[in-house]
A protein has these predicted regions:
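Phosphate/nucleotide-binding beta-alpha loop and adjacent structural elements of enzyme active sites
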Residues: 1-115
């Protein structure tokens, strides 16, 4: 279930999040969405990829879902990482031989590569 906040009569495009089906938040618009595991659809090997990941706190789930893609290809990642998730996401990427190459200060955006 996806939820977005309504401000001034408009649905906000940033800050949407995934919640449990029974979560009911005031002032939010809700809709259901199907989520897929990336590696079940991405059949890529020995490619050069650039991926942007901005998933509002679900960074590790997404990375785990594209693990084969990340291992089998040369990638540059731009990933927004919530502060509370940074250590686990950073450790996960380092364990897969990714190196942090740049950070946008005060924006929680990090760039990694395995090239």
């Amino acid at each position: 279930k996806m939820q977005t906040m309504v401000k001034f009569g408009y649905h906000q495009t940033g800050g949407a999040g995934v919640t449990n089906n029974d979560t009911n938040l005031k002032n939010h618009n809700s809709f259901f969405a199907d989520f897929k595991i990336g590696d079940e659809y991405l059949n890529l090997k020995d490619e050069k990829l650039s991926l942007k990941i901005d998933v509002e706190g679900h960074e590790l789930n997404v990375l785990e879902g594209i693990n084969k893609t990340l291992v089998n290809n040369k990638c540059i990642l731009q990933i927004e990482i919530f502060e509370k998730n940074f250590q686990s996401v950073n450790n996960y990427l380092l364990s897969m031989n990714y190196k942090k190459i740049f950070e946008v200060k005060n924006r929680s955006n990090f760039f990694y590569k395995n090239l």
